[in-house]
Amino acid sequence: MPDRPADKRYFADPAPGADETRFSVDNSSAQYYDSPYYKLHLSQVLEVPKPRTHPPILKLEHVWGHERVQQIIQSGQIAFHAVGDTGAARHTGPITEAHVADAMAAEFKGKPDSDPAFLYLLGDLIYNFGEDQYYYDQFYEPFRAYRAPIFAIPGNHDGVVYSDKAQSLAAFVKNFCAEKPVHPVEAGNLLRTSMTQPGVYFTLEAPFLSIVGLYSNVLEGPGVISSKNGRFPKVGDDQKTFLESELKRLKAKRGSIAAMHPTARRRGAARPARRGACSRPG
């Protein structure tokens, strides 16, 4: 690991090598999905890690620095990437993921007024159970050439666990919700440091834009962000209350986005928890 000043942020490697074409799999998916613990808890939500700050708000300037943010403001516009389900589900998956990551990295032209300001990952970064040993192959290595901050909200695959010894979202929190930027073991010899989001759900404040990112828990389907009147006591209502508060605070601002995983559905209406939260602020 190269020497570097403490608390300094690093994004891309200056001379990234060739893309991976495959990675080793320690356990088969069947071994996870057939575990008694996973089957027993298949229809249960898991506790949501508490945010480190209240309210959980992160300013882009805190990550990028004053100079870069001023460049964005002076340009009068902001460009960014947003993509979900980037994890490589199979050992040959890095090929497909690398094509997408490389295409985004190629959009950096050294022009502050048009270069992407950040990448926002919309969940399911790591398949199949968010294990820390796959963060190198499914996150750090594919995005080693991306020359900007990367923020993320977790998806169900990032949080689901297969045994009572696995802590939900532990690896995600370590790599994206660190108290200060450090070089995580999962990054290997790559330069990117951990992100310092205040929590797994938070608001990213950027010039011309605010993104309210939510964590929809581990169930398949539209997700859960509240207790639903006591049906999911492990979840509680903190996240829904946060969403309501942020929608009210940001009501007068242009460019406010609420993001969660899954990001869209082809059929059916929004579920009551989200519909109610979005309607209360008016």
Model regions and ranges:
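Active-site-proximal beta-strand elements of phosphoester/diester hydrolases
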Residues: Q77-R90, F208-P222, A258-H261
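Acidic, histidine-bearing metal-coordination/catalytic regions of metal-dependent phosphoesterases
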Residues: M1-F118, Y136-A152, D164-F202, R254
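Flexible, acidic/histidine-containing loops and adjacent segments that form or flank the divalent-metal
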Residues: Y38, I153-K248
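Catalytic cores of eukaryotic secretory-pathway lumenal/extracellular enzymes that build
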Residues: L125-N128, P142, L204, L214, ...
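Phosphate/oxyanion-binding active-site loops and adjacent basic polyanion-contact surfaces
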Residues: A88-A101, F129-Y135, F232-Q239, S279
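Active-site neighborhood of phospho(di)ester-bond hydrolases with catalytic His/Asp-centered motifs
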Residues: A82-G84, A117-D124, N128, I150-N156, ...
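His/acidic metal-ligating clusters that form di-metal
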Residues: D7-R9, D19-T21, D26-L42, E47-V48, ...
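Active-site environment of divalent metal-dependent phosphoester hydrolases
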Residues: A89-R90, Y127-G130, H157-D164, L219-P222, ...
